């Protein structure tokens, strides 16, 4: 039986994007090439390698930051298999529709939700081209403070999150 490659979506704002200039803060165990954790980049899935800063996708959002993807090494070791990540994150965003700045709202055209769908389709294409079986295992969503300020964003958060996950 062929291996089913497990893909996780890592989406969100602020700290999920990774904060700039702090790769040196990674514990030694995580500050190395991670052969069992692959992250989607402009070139397809690559092993996470902190010194190459390939953990920031899309590259337009690169800022030399650390976030949760480095710790997926623990999940890969626990499962005894490789983990694939599709990360799409950008700081200073919210789920609430906002026509003055980029947001995650599914009603926004050409913004973060649409970019996420493109990244997912790129991952599917990469797997299919290589004849790999895959399944999407879950979503790791990191909320930012933009979803609690203003109050209207907080009041709409539950429904906006349901809409995002339902796609």
Segments (PLM) and residue ranges:
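Cell-envelope and extracellular/periplasmic
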Residues: 1-167
